[in-house]
Amino acid sequence: MNKTYGLLLSLLPLVTAAASAENLPPPVDFNREIRPILSDKCFSCHGPDKKKRKGRLRLDLEKSARDPKKSAIVPGKLEKSELYLRITTDDTDERMPPEESGKSLTAEEIELLSRWITEGARWSEHWAYVPPRKHKLPNVKKTGWPTSWIDRFTLGHIEKSGQEPAPDADPVTLVRRVYFDLTGLPPEPGAVDAFQANPTPKAYEALVDRLLASEHYGERMAAYWLDLVRFADTVGYHGDQDHSISPYRDWVIDSFNADLPFDQFTREQLAGDLLPKATTGQLIATGYNRLLQTSHEGGVQAKEYIAMYAADRVRNVSQVWMGATMGCAQCHAHKYDPYTARDFYAMAAFFADVDDTAHLKNGTNSLPTRREPEISVLNRKQRRQLTVLDKNIANKQALQAKTPAPELTAEIKTLKAERASLQKTARKTMITRATRPRVTRILPRGDWLDDSGPVVEPGIPEFMGTIASGK
């Protein structure tokens, strides 16, 4: 046999295997594809609820699900995995989920579970709890294409899928993209022509810097944040009365434009009133704690609504700052995330010094609603005008002290009247002022009428450890 021919034959299985590997679907993603199935179809009987759990089997915890004594899931061994046998059996008495549950698995779900077990039943933590790690830059063929490290990852995926990078955008497209990305607005007249005349990397960098310095950049970024914190100018219930909170919106815009560090951005919103010598801006930031649906009907049960407001704050803080949904834990331990009812109410205790009792008592159905505590503030333009007026008044008064003159007296009077008129245009905005904290209890199954739950102190979820004292 020809040696070259023999070598080709010997390599054929390797080539075939490589080609087959390329055609295989990607590994099953536990968080995206398996966890939702288990949560929807299995956890009601094999989840965290002790009273409803059957067969002493938990499928919400990896250790229990893969317990060799139970053989519910045997990684890589489909026919020895009780879960697979139960979801594929024709015996209606043995099949899972049971008929009386009103739930059934689709053929696609069964196929996903089967593939997952065959692939080793790999478990994954929720992405929000996985510490970030540095990844090695992928090798790429078009080494001249990437202009930054992130381009290497982009190109790596493109090449892996057998595709080619899109051609570079033309100058007009590039200008339009950067304007919409950074300001949400189309280019102003002349901007496209100017860049077309000089489409160099330095010109592009200068354009980006100019747009980042624009007030519209803060407006663009603030839109995302305001959606997250459920900003609204009305109370949100059936009457949907107006309330005064627009200065908080302006504070968010200003914060993005000023590149306020995120830790400071967070601290001022959650507890700006507790900072030493809190500024007007820091008090405005505490309006975050007042951004929730509120009722001002005469017949509301204060205790019920205080419980609702506390739960709303925990839901929003956990979603916005922790990338998590703690709402389930208001009534019971979360189905698969590591949150308990104690965690939920310990988080609520952080906000027990927000005086919701006073808010309910002082609020009315008038337009706009009266929502103490409030402060009156000027907008950016008005603050600049006030600064100029104060400077002019001080200068005139200094001259008057040296050389008294009737015309100076008249000018000072006019400036002071202008200042007083400007102050009258100030807007009210809701803020937070800490009061004596309410006692916070775990509400069994979220029932605000049930005071039998234990008292909890402010604390972060237990699995996160303890809060540093700062001393």
Predicted features and spans:
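Positively charged n-region of N-terminal signal peptides that target proteins for export
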Residues: M1-T4
